[in-house]
């Protein structure tokens, strides 16, 4: 059904188009992807004729800074936080919409002599800024395109177009398979691209290891840094986790208010304590404490979100009101830490199916979801209900 990453890279180097699919629990779609360095009017025409989606150009932040490409909006409320810049046309184009002129704009975007003033705004080419770290940081088509370009040794920019069926519906995997067969195109998944990069790259470093006695038992604590940002994470390991058997794991995102101050607004503190106690009882397991405060928006923004909740917004609406998606967490670094610990098969302590999908995308097998439900308090009943209704959490309330 799917091709190897190496096969896709060979075709991309020849100027061909490939199809890249993401996870069914994310956008669940496929995009045509080509290298921007080799773009032609013919490739653009193929994409708009058979893809029917929006033609975008994933680039690095360096390109955006050099060409003064500002964000399209000041508050991005897109559910996947896709980083659109202002759209552009090269000044040499007329309307900018033809396949030839769109190709010209893309070619000039890559021209090292180009300046911001060489592009009209708005236009018909939509640059997207890829996250530093690529698909290991964000498992999206934007990052996949830039990663593929880098792996090909080309300029770090791609051209992508969503694939839509003739009836206007989004093409899903069965449709994409037929499309790939019809046009003899290689088809890969972002999950496989992540696995390929993980096999060839390491982004986390063990910095310190100690014995940590706690109220719940004694753990082996390992501190990690990573090359994507300045955040430091810690793994608390219990027992021998090198046997190859599935290991009980809790991936816990930092919550200062709940973990330290015992806030009743959430169930984070009780979940943390219950997870440590359960790992201690089993005599083997890992609690990975990730510095992703407030589902990734940070402490101060979490407090601002709490203020909005006091005004009647729920937890998802509050995030969106502040310009954030409902959940900004990524699992790439956490997955690398778990892999560094030698884990392959997990029994995951979680109520969040998205966390399962997030980790499985990084070559970790979740063989069992172990529920971690805490008794609801009067102050967090509404919060927990929103997690069920809008975030898909598996709770019995």
From Swiss-Prot:
Zn(2+) binds at residues 255, 266, 268. Its EC number is 4.1.99.12, 3.5.4.25. Pathway: Cofactor biosynthesis; riboflavin biosynthesis; 2-hydroxy-3-oxobutyl phosphate from D-ribulose 5-phosphate: step 1/1; Cofactor biosynthesis; riboflavin biosynthesis; 5-amino-6-(D-ribitylamino)uracil from GTP: step 1/4. Keywords: GTP-binding, Hydrolase, Lyase, Magnesium, Manganese, Metal-binding, Multifunctional enzyme, Nucleotide-binding, Riboflavin biosynthesis, Zinc. This is Riboflavin biosynthesis protein RibBA. The keyword Transmembrane helix does not apply. One of its GO terms (cellular component) is cytosol. Its cofactor is Mg(2+); Mn(2+); Zn(2+). Pfam families: DHBP_synthase (PF00926), GTP_cyclohydro2 (PF00925). Mg(2+) 1 binds at residue 27. Catalyzes the conversion of D-ribulose 5-phosphate to formate and 3,4-dihydroxy-2-butanone 4-phosphate. Catalyzes the conversion of GTP to 2,5-diamino-6-ribosylamino-4(3H)-pyrimidinone 5'-phosphate (DARP), formate and pyrophosphate. D-ribulose 5-phosphate binds at residues 26-27, 31, 138-142, 162. InterPro entries: DHBP_synth_RibB-like_a/b_dom (IPR017945), DHBP_synthase_RibB (IPR000422), GTP_cyclohydro_II (IPR032677), RibA (IPR000926), RibA-like_sf (IPR036144), Riboflavin_synth_RibBA (IPR016299).
């Amino acid at each position: 059904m799917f091709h190897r990453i190496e096969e896709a890279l060979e075709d991309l180097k020849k100027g061909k188009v490939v199809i890249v699919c993401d996870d069914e629990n994310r956008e669940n779609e496929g995009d045509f992807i080509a290298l921007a360095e080799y773009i032609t009017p013919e490739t653009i025409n193929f994409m708009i004729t058979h893809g029917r989606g929006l033609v975008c150009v994933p680039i690095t932040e360096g390109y955006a800074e050099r060409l003064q490409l500002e964000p399209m909006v000041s508050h991005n409320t897109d559910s996947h936080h896709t980083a659109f810049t202002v759209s552009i046309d090269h000044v040499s184009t007329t309307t900018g919409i033809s396949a030839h002129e769109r190709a010209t704009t893309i070619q000039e975007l890559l021209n090292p002599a180009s300046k911001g003033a060489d592009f009209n705004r708005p236009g018909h080419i939509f640059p997207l800024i890829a996250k530093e770290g690529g698909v290991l940081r964000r498992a999206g088509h934007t990052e996949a395109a830039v990663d593929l370009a880098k792996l090909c040794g080309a300029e770090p920019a791609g051209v992508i177009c969503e694939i839509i069926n003739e009836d206007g519906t989004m093409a899903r995997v069965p449709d994409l398979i037929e499309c790939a067969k019809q046009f003899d195109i290689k088809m890969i998944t972002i999950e496989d691209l992540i696995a390929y990069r993980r096999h060839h790259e390491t982004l986390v470093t063990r910095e310190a290891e100690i014995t940590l006695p706690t109220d719940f038992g004694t753990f082996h604590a390992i501190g990690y840094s990573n090359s994507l940002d300045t955040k430091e994470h810690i793994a608390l390991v219990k027992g021998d986790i090198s046997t190859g058997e599935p290991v009980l794991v809790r991936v816990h995102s930092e919550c200062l208010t709940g973990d330290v101050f015992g806030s009743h607004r959430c169930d984070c503190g009780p979940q943390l304590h219950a997870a440590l106690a359960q790992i201690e009882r089993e005599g083997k397991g890992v609690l990975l404490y990730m510095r992703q405060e407030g589902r990734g928006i940070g402490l101060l923004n979490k407090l601002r979100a709490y203020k909005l909740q006091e005004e009647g917004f729920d937890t998802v609406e509050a995030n969106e009101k502040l310009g954030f998606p409902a959940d900004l967490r990524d699992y790439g670094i956490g997955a690398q830490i778990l892999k560094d610990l030698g884990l392959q098969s997990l029994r995951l302590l979680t109520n969040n199916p998205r966390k399962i999908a997030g980790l499985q995308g990084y070559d970790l097998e979740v063989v069992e979801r172990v529920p971690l439900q805490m008794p609801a308090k009067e102050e967090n009943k509404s919060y927990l209900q929103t997690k069920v209704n809008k975030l898909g959490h598996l709770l019995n309330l």
